[in-house]
Amino acid sequence: MAAVTAAAVSTSAAAAVTKASPSPAHCFLPCPPRTRAAHQRGLLLRAQVSTTDAAAVAAAPAKKEKISKKHDEGVVTNKYRPKEPYVGKCLLNTKITADDAPGETWHMVFSTEGEIPYREGQSIGVIADGVDKNGKPHKLRLYSIASSALGDFGDSKTVSLCVKRLVYTNDQGEIVKGVCSNFLCDLKPGSDVKITGPVGKEMLMPKDPNANIIMLATGTGIAPFRSFLWKMFFEKYDDYKFNGLAWLFLGVPTSSSLLYKEEFDKMKAKAPENFRVDYAVSREQTNAQGEKMYIQTRMAEYKEELWELLKKDHTYVYMCGLKGMEKGIDDIMVSLAAKDGIDWADYKKQLKKGEQWNVEVY
């Protein structure tokens, strides 16, 4: 499950203070008396310097304010913090993977009564009930929001998550359960849940309704893209109608692990010209060379088409999920860029600067 991380940076004010040199008015060394002519020359010199400075300021170009390409106007962050979280109610909690899937993933809906004004692409924090081994409250865990800003019920009063239950065996052979993921997956309707946020601006949707949006997800990294796609294809707005191309690549281990497939099938039937989806099922599929079908393997089948899209200034790439996917995708892009004499590392920096390459991996 991808999550937006936040870091607070503290800077010492003292480090920014520079000791000022004493002005001539405060100099106590004896100075020879100045003549009237010298005084006038001093005034003239100061006047010339002032005029030159003013001209330089006037000639300096005004700093251009950066205008974001994303829906960032009025975005709210950190309305609720760990010390004073919002307490919502679990309304729905459903397992969305088959019984034979390697691991459980749950879709859950919490009431917010409109008090958490999030946008598509943001995250919320959840604080599990109870205390840790030191007797302190559990730390929050961040989860990407899986619903549009209107919520699954369409009334802007709920928020949804897509959570995989974390269970693993450590080096000592002990079974370890992730505190927050198990707390969430075990929630019953009517239970309280402590929520913080919303947080994050990296994964906000583009403003342009004609944009090409390429979404790359593994597992529960699908969450923010479900929020995008609901807004694009399941909802109606007076000021937004998606007319571009939304292309989703989703990587999972087995077909029983595919998340929200029925929803995506409906979207594809509704808008075949605007929505494409390709799955990579690593334990069941292989490419022509017999290699396991990971997300980057599936993308390689369309690499020329993807590269041509990526060269357009209205194409945006969003990546969410396991960190390991990033290198495989970079490897594809390196060879494609090289054919055009482009250094991929430099080009990716330009894309990031232009908000066209957006990554949230863990």
Curated annotation (Swiss-Prot):
It catalyses: 2 reduced [2Fe-2S]-[ferredoxin] + NADP(+) + H(+) = 2 oxidized [2Fe-2S]-[ferredoxin] + NADPH. Residues 83-205 form the FAD-binding FR-type domain. Keywords: Chloroplast, Disulfide bond, Electron transport, FAD, Flavoprotein, Membrane, NADP, Oxidoreductase, Phosphoprotein, Photosynthesis, Plastid, Thylakoid, Transit peptide, Transport. Disulfide bonds join C180-C185. Its EC number is 1.18.1.2. Gene3D superfamilies: Nucleotide-binding domain of ferredoxin-NADP reductase (FNR) module, Translation factors. Its cofactor is FAD. It holds the Pfam family NAD_binding_1. It is found in: Plastid, Chloroplast stroma; Plastid, Chloroplast thylakoid membrane. The modification Phosphoserine is found at S181. One of its GO terms (molecular function) is ferredoxin-NADP+ reductase activity. Residues 1-62 form a transit peptide. GO terms for cellular component: chloroplast stroma; chloroplast thylakoid membrane protein complex. Pathway: Energy metabolism; photosynthesis. Its main location: plastid. Component of high molecular weight thylakoid LFNRs-containing protein complexes containing LIR1, LFNR1, LFNR2, TIC62 and TROL proteins. Interacts directly with LIR1 and TIC62; LIR1 increases the affinity of LFNR1 and LFNR2 for TIC62. May play a key role in regulating the relative amounts of cyclic and non-cyclic electron flow to meet the demands of the plant for ATP and reducing power. Belongs to the ferredoxin--NADP reductase type 1 family. This is Ferredoxin--NADP reductase, leaf isozyme 1, chloroplastic. It comes from Oryza sativa subsp. japonica.
